[in-house]
UniProtKB/Swiss-Prot annotation:
Residues 37-85 form the BPTI/Kunitz inhibitor domain. Keywords: Disulfide bond, Protease inhibitor, Secreted, Serine protease inhibitor, Signal. PANTHER family: EPPIN (PTHR46751), WAP FOUR-DISULFIDE CORE DOMAIN PROTEIN 6A (PTHR46751:SF1). This is Kunitz-type U15-theraphotoxin-Hhn1i. The lineage of its organism: Eukaryota, Metazoa, Ecdysozoa, Arthropoda, Chelicerata.
Length: 88
């Protein structure tokens, strides 16, 4: 049973990396800096309820942020989100 549990954990980790890694690569500038406006929404690790905005590539969309963790594509207002992420 220990081997089966280990293999399941390795498989789960592999799938998570395959899903997450391309999203992080696509958010990277040519000079290696990450463009936070291209990161996916991330509600974080806690269970609190903060209504925030993230830039979805076109507009700023509401989402629930848990209060800890997540990424920097998170803004308190639509105005702040558009100011940082909207391309003129």
């Amino acid at each position: 049973m220990g081997t089966a549990r280990f293999l399941r954990a390795v498989l789960l980790l592999s799938v998570l990396l395959m899903v997450t890694f391309p999203a992080l690569l696509s958010a990277e500038h040519h000079d290696g800096r990450v463009d936070i406006c291209r990161l996916p929404s991330d509600s974080g690790d806690c269970l609190r309820f903060f209504e925030m905005r993230y830039f979805d590539g076109t507009t700023c969309t509401k989402f629930v942020y848990g209060g800890y963790g997540g990424n920097d594509n998170r803004f308190p207002t639509e105005k702040a989100c558009m100011k940082r992420c909207a391309k003129a």
